Structure formats: structure tokens, C-alpha cells
Amino acid sequence: MCEKLRKEEAMKRIFDLLKKQSPSRIIALGFGAVILTGAILLMMPFSVKKGVHLSFLNALFTSTSAVCVTGLVVVDTADSFTAIGQMVITMLIQIGGLGIASVGVGLIIAAGKRVSIKSRLMVKEALNVDTYGGMVRLVRVVLAITLGFEAVGALISFIVFRKDYSPLHAIGISIFHSIAAFNNAGFDNLGGMHNLIPYKDNILLNITTDILVIAGGL
């Protein structure tokens, strides 16, 4: 019982400390926390393929690259990570592309709770807009457009990838590719560091990818 009270007290202190921070500092701390959490998850046995040794430095680099959507890799995504590991990278790319504040507010909206003024200020800071009025509606629109484009992109990509992979594998590749393309992440999970070179003559996939990259960059 005492241990539980100590944990609750520690969590209360952390939340009280965060409340005193500026929106920009909270966003920076949020990115740092997501990157560190991502690195730890990528080092877990369920994330790394058998026989692959992933150092903390390489896991941290991969997580940072995914969250900051730079596209730089030090290990091949498909050859090094399991389906769960690739799912972690996909989530990191999505969070990095949308932004910590937008994801946080989106979760609050999904939970049916009221979005606080501080949360609105964080979104204002992250999206670089002049007013925090209409922030909830803006986040809803951003999330809807993002998920809409990614869903359509994944569906079209599946039409291409299902010819070369099993249905389940093709679904995984399609979702990963669509999210990575829309967020301009530069990651691929086709293996062998080939990226989309094997599909350089596939007009449908190339046009779809181009549209995702352009739409995500707007």
C-alpha cells in the first residue's frame, strides 16, 4: 500500500512539474520521451529478428530518425526488425509526422474529454498558427486528412505488393509504405536496402507515392 502511495505521489510531482513548463518545452520533452521510449521498444526481443544484435546507439538512431522523419538508417528495416518492430517504427513515424501535440489532443478527443487551454496552446505552438481558437476542429481535420490519404495510399499499394508477397505481408508493407511516404520519412521495409528500386517501372505505385509525398508535405 505504501509503495502504491509513493508511486502516486511521484506521478503527481511529475504532472505538477509539467504544468509549470511552457508549451514549447513540453513539446520538446515529449519528443525526447517518445524517441527514448521508441529506442527501448526497438531493443526488445519481440522487435528484433533472431540473430540480429541491435545496440542502444543504433536503436536510438533509428527511433530519432523515425520521429524526426529524416529517413536515415543504420540497419535495414526489413532484415533487422520483426513485424512488431516495424510496427513500432511506423508508429514513431506517424507521431513524428503529426506532431506530439496533435497526437496528444487527438487522443483526448478520442477519449471524449475536454481539451484544456494548455493543450490548445501546445497545438498552436506546434502548428505555428496565430490563434488557439478552433484548435480542436483543426486537429480533427488534420487527423482526418492524414488517415484518409494514408488509407487510400495503403489500399493502392496493396494492389501492387500483393503480386509479390503473401496477403498478410503485403498489407504490412502497404501500410508501412503509405505512412512513411505521406510523412516524408524515407523509410522502407522491402529488405536488402533496395527501397523502391524493384518497382521503378511501376507507374501506379510511383504516382501513388508521389501524391502521398506531396500531400504530406503541404
Give residue ranges: language-model regions.
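Membrane-proximal intracellular helices of multi-pass ion channels
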Residues: 1-218
